[in-house]
Amino acid sequence: VIIFVLEFNLYMEKEEILFWLPRVLAILFIVFLALFALDVFVPGESILYMIGGFLVHLIPDYLLIAALIIAWKRERIGGVLFILLGLGFTIFFRTYSALSNFLIVSFPVFLIGTLFLCHKYLVIRR
């Protein structure tokens, strides 16, 4: 799959790459974060407790999905939203205390927001 994506990207223009890259990265990051919500499913707990915990653990994903939906059509607003979410993740999850935590949780959100803004300004310049 990765080889196909890399080969496909070789034939894309810079503008097309900047269009799809933040969207694909956002989807992959949302799926990555959703994996952490699966830790609530443990034997011996009630199903309602586990489902409630699962839905609460997915709150960051809900925010990212909302930002992605907005960014898909309104890149400037979406890019700013992603950067603000990155700042919120940094503060709320305290990723500023360890570089590895910052690089895993907050940096991808900042990067996605920056890529949305870069594409928007590249399109404006043309």
Question: Which sequence ranges carry the predicted segments?
Answer:
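Short, Lys/Arg-enriched N-terminal segments with co-localized hydrophobic residues
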Residues: 1-11
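Hydrophobic, membrane-inserted alpha-helices
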Residues: 62-68, 85-90
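Alpha-helical transmembrane segments and their immediate juxtamembrane flanks
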Residues: 15-21, 25-29, 37, 42-43, ...
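Aromatic-anchored segments of alpha-helical transmembrane domains
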Residues: 30-37, 84-94
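Membrane-interface helix termini and inter-helical loops of multi-pass transporters
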Residues: 41-51
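Membrane-interface helix caps and helix-loop-helix hairpins in membrane proteins
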Residues: 46-47, 94-102
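Membrane-helix interface "capping/anchor" motifs
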Residues: 69-80
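Alpha-helical transmembrane segments of polytopic membrane proteins
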Residues: 52-61, 103-107
